[in-house]
Amino acid sequence: IAHMGLHEKVCQMMFVNPENLVLSHDVTKLDKEFKSALKKYPVGGIMLKSKNIQTKKQLKKLLKKMQDNSDITLFLAVDEEGGTVSRVMQKLGNIDGGDIGSMYDYRNLGGDIAYENARQIGDNLSYYGFNLDFAPVADVWSNPGNTVIGKRAYSNIYSEAAELIPYAVRGFHAGGVLCTLKHFPGHGNTKEDSHYGNAYVYETKDDLENNEFQSFRAGIDAGADFVMVGHMIVTDISNIPSDLSKEIVTDILRTELGFSGVIITDSLQMESITD
């Protein structure tokens, strides 16, 4: 970092979709326009979506070419949680065989299953060339009316999620990828979906400490590499989205919870931010 110029340092803070660099078309290969954009904007990471994925051979080639043509090693990421949020395995299958459903459906089967599911996901991602997964979901489905998290969560019970998340973290690592706890400080008790507007958390800070933070603390202690901070507004702490809040990001996540890894925002294209 000491040898980087200001432009490089700013670009390194950006995690983008390929289409943020190539505005004219969906990216499925490293064409001239994409290659030039990577050189001009040395971003820190690139996240692929389903539209960027066609075949096993195509995906491996795309990821390798992106990495080979970046002067600074890229984080290459995807949303691969299992179940409904699956960009790679839903399209290309599981190289280890079988299907992996929503994590919530395995909640009564113990930590070894949470580990094995995460390991298989990691196996698949690292096979193609990804080095980071935006998973596991550390939110707890505590509000039955919550639709944005739902069965993406490992449990609807705080203590149970806190038991399972460390197994998942270790499983992803065993599969060869870094992992991300999301969506801090907890999106499972909201009524609203932050994809489509402001989502509010009405719990007090003490409530969060005793409830939502359990699974995040457990994941951090297990060695999670990234924490994704969501756009939820915690009314007891701040009147702005959590990922813009010093109280949430610096005072609580970095200082109180002691997380020293990479902190990343949720997508800045979501309506809770763009509106």
Predicted regions and their residues:
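Active-site-adjacent structural elements in enzyme catalytic domains
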Residues: I53-F75, G82, N108-G129
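Acidic helix-start/capping segments at beta-turn-to-alpha-helix junctions
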Residues: E80-T84, V140-N143
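Second-shell residues forming the walls of enzyme active-site clefts
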Residues: G5, L23-E33, N52-Q67, L74, ...
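Mature N-terminal segment immediately following signal peptide/propeptide cleavage
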Residues: I1-L21, K39
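A substrate-binding/cap region within the structured catalytic cores of diverse enzymes
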Residues: D99-F130, A135-V169, H173
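Non-catalytic positions within long, well-ordered alpha-helices that form the structural scaffold/packing
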Residues: L38-K39, S126, I220, T255
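Hydrophobic faces of well-ordered beta-strands that scaffold small-molecule active sites
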Residues: C11-P18, G44-L48, L74-E80, L132-P136, ...
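A short aromatic-anchored loop/beta-hairpin motif
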Residues: S36-S50
